Amino acid sequence: MNKKQLKIVTGVAIAVLIVSIIPMLWISQYLHPFADDYVFGAEVYKIWNETHSFPACVQTAWNVAMTMYHTWQGTYSACFLMALQPGVFGQYWLGTFILISSLVTSTYTLLYMVMRKLLHSSRLEYLFVSTLFVLMTIQFTWSYYDAFYWYNGAMYYTLFYSMSLFLASLLIGYQLSSSKFKKALIRGASIVLS
């Protein structure tokens, strides 16, 4: 495939990706909290309605996560994010945006590190392959509801999968970096993502 053809098919692939995501985001306006969304978000919802203080909500989410850690399960980082789900602020639709955005950006980021930094592919080759990969990942999702529309369920899968892709990108960046300062920053970000 020559450069002109690659440019055309890359543009078409990006357009198809955007067109396929728009209805998914549009549908999200009709979502509402469900099942575990209420369990994990109840305390934060109460605090938000009483104080409208985001720092107080973060503290409450931390308390929910610690309670879950000590009494039920050790997935404290997920429990923290589930307690802060957008539905407690009346913006449940934001969950779909967060989940799709994290999946798209993390996939593009990892493939950038692999294709551009390790394999030295051209920008167009990277964009084409990355776009196809993201398109297939989204289109062949087994359950859209569990992956993008049910915030608490998708936290464990879509968001943490995306975070693992970001972590892999950071680890590649760490190996490629010769700067001690950059390595220290990457180390810190890797600890947060781990």
Task: Please tell me what each predicted stretch does.
Residues 98-124, 166:
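Transmembrane-helix motifs of polytopic, lipid-linked glycan transferases
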Residues 1-21:
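Start-transfer (signal-anchor) and selected internal transmembrane alpha helices
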Residues 93-102, 153-161:
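Alpha-helical transmembrane segments of polytopic membrane proteins
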Residues 184-194:
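Membrane-interface alpha helices of multi-pass inner-membrane proteins
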Residues 63-90, 94-97:
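Short hydrophobic/aromatic helix or loop-helix immediately within or flanking a transmembrane segment
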